[in-house]
Amino acid sequence: MTLSPYLQEVAKRRTFAIISHPDAGKTTITEKVLLFGQAIQTAGTVKGRGSNQHAKSDWMEMEKQRGISITTSVMQFPYHDCLVNLLDTPGHEDFSEDTYRTLTAVDCCLMVIDAAKGVEDRTRKLMEVTRLRDTPILTFMNKLDRDIRDPMELLDEVENELKIGCAPITWPIGCGKLFKGVYHLYKDETYLYQSGKGHTIQEVRIVKGLNNPDLDAAVGEDLAQQLRDELELVKGASNEFDKELFLAGEITPVFFGTALGNFGVDHMLDGLVEWAPAPMPRQTDTRTVEASEDKFTGFVFKIQANMDPKHRDRVAFMRVVSGKYEKGMKLRQVRTAKDVVISDALTFMAGDRSHVEEAYPGDILGLHNHGTIQIGDTFTQGEMMKFTGIPNFAPELFRRIRLKDPLKQKQLLKGLVQLSEEGAVQVFRPISNNDLIVGAVGVLQFDVVVSRLKSEYNVEAVYESVNVATARWVECADAKKFEEFKRKNESQLALDGGDNLAYIATSMVNLRLAQERYPDVQFHQTREH
C-alpha cells in the first residue's frame, strides 16, 4: 500500500530537542548537526575569542555576550530521506520554564552528557520532564577528545540515576590524546578518528570486523585488545537495543563521540532518523488528535519578543499536530473563538527567517503576534478543543522592580507584561499597592529582564529584594467563601500577567497557615496555559 503524498510528508518528519547540563556541549552538537544537515557551511565554535562568528543558534544581545543559548530557536534541515526539526532549548540552569514547554512540542530528545563528568543536576531535572510523556531518548556521550570516566561506569550512572536502560550502539576506543575512534556494535565496523577536522565533514576511515588485523594496525595492539575485552563485558552486562522499549522511553541507545571534533554526531543522527517516531498523537481536553488527520490543529508552546532587532515584533511558536498548513488559510483561535487568516507564517533556519507556503505535522510555525496570542493557545479549523499539558510553574525567586525614572511606569508595565506573556518571567501586581513583583525560576532571568527592558523598551530599572517566598494560584468553587478569603487576605493577593489571582506568601509557614485556614480554597503550584 502506498501512502498518500500527505502521509508521506508526515512520515518524513522528526522533531526533537537536545537536553543537557550547561557546558556539556549542546550548542556545539547543534552546530554539527546543522553541518551534517547542510544547513550551515562552516560551524562557528561557540566562544570564538574575538571572532565575530557566533554560534548560529545563539542570538539575543545577552546571549552574544555570555556565550549561552538563552532562547529556544527552531532549525529545520534535511537528513537522508527525512526532514528534521531541531528545537534548541536553553542550556543554562535558569531557563527551565521555557525549556520545559519546549519539551512538550517534541517527539524525541537527544540527551548530551559530558563523558568526563557524567550525569549532572540539570540533566536529571530535564529527564523528569520527559518522563511525564515517556518521550523517547537518545544519548550522546560527548567530549571523548578529553580524558573521560570509564564508559561502563557512565552507563551504570545513567541507568541508576535516570532510571532508563542503556543500549550502547557505538563504543569508544581510548580517549583524550589516545582517542582512536568508535566501534559500531550492530554493524561490526570501526570508525577511525582524525583530530583537527571539527569544522568540516570528514571522510572517515572504516575498518570492517572486530578481529580484522587492520584494526590492530590502525589503533595499536593494546587498544585493540582492550576494545575486544570491553566488548565482551558490554555484551554481557548491557541491554540490547529494542525499538519498542526505546519508543516507550524505557531504554536509550547510547553513542560516543566528540562534537568539537565533529566525530560520532552522524552515527547519532542515523539512529535518530531510523528509530525516532514520526509525529505523535496529542491529547486535548476532549479527544486524542492523530497526526494523520486531515484537518489542521496546532498549539503555541513559546512566545519570543523581538526575534528581529529590525522589526519590533513578537513571534509565537506553534507546533503543528495534524493537517497541512497552507498560506492564507483560516484558523480558529480556540481561546478567543475568533477566526484568523494566517498568510505570513515563518519557518526557521536559526536566525534566518523565511515565509512558509506549507507545513506538516511535526513542523514548527512562527506566527506574528501583536499581543493577541498566548502560550498554550490552540488553533484548529473550527473544532473547539484545547491541547493539554503545557505548564506554568510557580516561581521560586522574587524581586521588586523599581524604575529609575518614575515617569516611565506605563512603558515598564507594557514591557513586563510582554515579557511575561513570552514566559521569560512572571509578573505579579499586588492588589493593595503599586509595586511590581517579578517571579522567576532562576536568578539569571532577573538580569535578562533588566537588560531587555533597557534595550527593547528603553526603560532603566533595577531590581531589589522583596519579602516574598512563594506564590500559588488560587481558586474556589464557593463564591461566598472566596469573597471572604479575598477580603481578609487583600494585602497578600496579586494579579499575574494574565490577570489570574495569586496568593503571595511571605514564607512557607505563612502559606501553610493560609491553606489550613481556608480549606475550600485551592492553592495551585502550576497553572495550565
Curated annotation (Swiss-Prot):
<dbReference type="InterPro" id="IPR005225">
    <property type="entry name" value="Small_GTP-bd"/>
</dbReference>
<dbReference type="GO" id="GO:0016150">
    <property type="term" value="F:translation release factor activity, codon nonspecific"/>
</dbReference>
<keyword id="KW-0648">Protein biosynthesis</keyword>
<dbReference type="InterPro" id="IPR035647">
    <property type="entry name" value="EFG_III/V"/>
</dbReference>
<dbReference type="GO" id="GO:0005829">
    <property type="term" value="C:cytosol"/>
</dbReference>
<dbReference type="GO" id="GO:0006449">
    <property type="term" value="P:regulation of translational termination"/>
</dbReference>
<feature type="binding site">
    <location>
        <begin position="142"/>
        <end position="145"/>
    </location>
    <ligand>
        <name>GTP</name>
    </ligand>
</feature>
<dbReference type="InterPro" id="IPR032090">
    <property type="entry name" value="RF3_C"/>
</dbReference>
<dbReference type="InterPro" id="IPR053905">
    <property type="entry name" value="EF-G-like_DII"/>
</dbReference>
<protein>
    <recommendedName>
        <fullName>Peptide chain release factor 3</fullName>
    </recommendedName>
</protein>
<comment type="function">
    <text>Increases the formation of ribosomal termination complexes and stimulates activities of RF-1 and RF-2. It binds guanine nucleotides and has strong preference for UGA stop codons. It may interact directly with the ribosome. The stimulation of RF-1 and RF-2 is significantly reduced by GTP and GDP, but not by GMP.</text>
</comment>
<dbReference type="Pfam" id="PF22042">
    <property type="entry name" value="EF-G_D2"/>
</dbReference>
<dbReference type="InterPro" id="IPR009000">
    <property type="entry name" value="Transl_B-barrel_sf"/>
</dbReference>
<dbReference type="Pfam" id="PF00009">
    <property type="entry name" value="GTP_EFTU"/>
</dbReference>
<dbReference type="InterPro" id="IPR004548">
    <property type="entry name" value="PrfC"/>
</dbReference>
<feature type="binding site">
    <location>
        <begin position="88"/>
        <end position="92"/>
    </location>
    <ligand>
        <name>GTP</name>
    </ligand>
</feature>
<keyword id="KW-0963">Cytoplasm</keyword>
<dbReference type="InterPro" id="IPR000795">
    <property type="entry name" value="T_Tr_GTP-bd_dom"/>
</dbReference>
<feature type="domain" description="tr-type G">
    <location>
        <begin position="11"/>
        <end position="280"/>
    </location>
</feature>
<dbReference type="GO" id="GO:0005525">
    <property type="term" value="F:GTP binding"/>
</dbReference>
<feature type="binding site">
    <location>
        <begin position="20"/>
        <end position="27"/>
    </location>
    <ligand>
        <name>GTP</name>
    </ligand>
</feature>
<dbReference type="GO" id="GO:0097216">
    <property type="term" value="F:guanosine tetraphosphate binding"/>
</dbReference>
<dbReference type="InterPro" id="IPR041732">
    <property type="entry name" value="RF3_GTP-bd"/>
</dbReference>
<dbReference type="InterPro" id="IPR027417">
    <property type="entry name" value="P-loop_NTPase"/>
</dbReference>
<dbReference type="InterPro" id="IPR031157">
    <property type="entry name" value="G_TR_CS"/>
</dbReference>
<keyword id="KW-0342">GTP-binding</keyword>
<dbReference type="GO" id="GO:0016149">
    <property type="term" value="F:translation release factor activity, codon specific"/>
</dbReference>
<keyword id="KW-0547">Nucleotide-binding</keyword>
<dbReference type="Pfam" id="PF16658">
    <property type="entry name" value="RF3_C"/>
</dbReference>
<dbReference type="GO" id="GO:0003924">
    <property type="term" value="F:GTPase activity"/>
</dbReference>
<dbReference type="InterPro" id="IPR038467">
    <property type="entry name" value="RF3_dom_3_sf"/>
</dbReference>
<comment type="similarity">
    <text>Belongs to the TRAFAC class translation factor GTPase superfamily. Classic translation factor GTPase family. PrfC subfamily.</text>
</comment>
